[in-house]
A protein has these predicted regions:
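A short glycine-rich, Lys/Arg-flanked "PGG" loop and its adjoining helix->strand segment in the class I
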Residues: 123-134
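Short conserved AdoMet
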Residues: 35, 117, 134
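A short acidic, Gly/Pro-enriched loop at the edge of an enzyme's catalytic core
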Residues: 95-105
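Class I SAM-dependent methyltransferase SAM/SAH-binding core
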Residues: 53-96
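Conserved class I S-adenosyl-L-methionine
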Residues: 1-48
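Short N-terminal helix/helix-N-cap motif within the alpha/beta-hydrolase-1
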Residues: 71, 99, 117-120
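A short SAM/SAH-binding and catalytic strip from SAM-dependent methyltransferases
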Residues: 104-120
Length: 134
């Protein structure tokens, strides 16, 4: 039996996610790895509601966010607009990602990588990361 692991809508409600994930204590960890050139293209995979995407964009970085869950992206877009930011948020599966562009830096925050349940899914996602790096 072949199983589609699209569980995003079952596990995450954007409003609940934002209420449970109000912390930004990990932001400094991610920021220390960002390129020094703020014009560098940054891609955040599994960006959710923009918990990290938005503060990084507020620092002047050129960042794009990808997520699988429409409700998360809707919330991220709303929050970015409220913050006066123009961020490109894209609905896509990181296992089959094909944005037709390259990035200087790509990261997957928090525990999102654990949603890739099978090794083949992890390898597909990592191959997509490789294909999108400059």
């Amino acid at each position: 039996m072949k199983t589609d692991y699209k569980v995003g809508e079952l596990i995450y409600d954007a409003n609940i996610y934002d209420r449970l994930n109000t912390f930004l204590s990990d932001l400094q960890f991610y920021k220390k790895w960002l390129p020094t050139n703020k014009e560098a293209r940054i891609l955040e995979l599994c960006c959710g509601t923009g918990r990290l995407t938005i503060p990084i964009a507020q620092e002047g970085y050129n960042i794009c966010g990808v997520d699988y869950t429409p409700s998360m992206l809707e919330q991220a877009k709303w929050k970015a607009t409220e913050a006066g930011l123009e961020i490109n948020f894209i609905e896509a599966d990181i296992r089959t990602l094909d944005l037709q562009e390259k990035f200087d830096f790509i990261f997957i925050p928090f525990n999102s990588i654990h949603h890739l349940y099978r090794n083949e899914d992890l390898f597909k996602a990592l191959a997509c990361v490789r294909n999108h790096l400059k």
